[in-house]
Amino acid sequence: MQVYGCCELVRELYAQIGSGDQAYIPQAISCAVKALNDVAADESLPKEVREKAAFAAANLLISDFEDK
């Protein structure tokens, strides 16, 4: 997936990180899994949203890519 296929908020933050206005996180996979886990655990959100986040987090965890 490329940035242009993402929502406006993601594109805005991408531009801010690229320009140095927002912090870059070297351990991006760990950051993504934590954020997805937070969404999956938030019982105030619709179940469908939580399940999508949990599925994405589980796939990242089972992948062979590791942050170093």
Swiss-Prot record:
Q: Which Pfam families match?
A: UPF0253
Cystine bridges? none
**HAMAP family, per database record:** UPF0253
NCBIfam families for this protein = PRK04964.1
Q: What family, per the record?
A: Belongs to the UPF0253 family.
In Swiss-Prot or TrEMBL terms, this protein is called UPF0253 protein VP2335
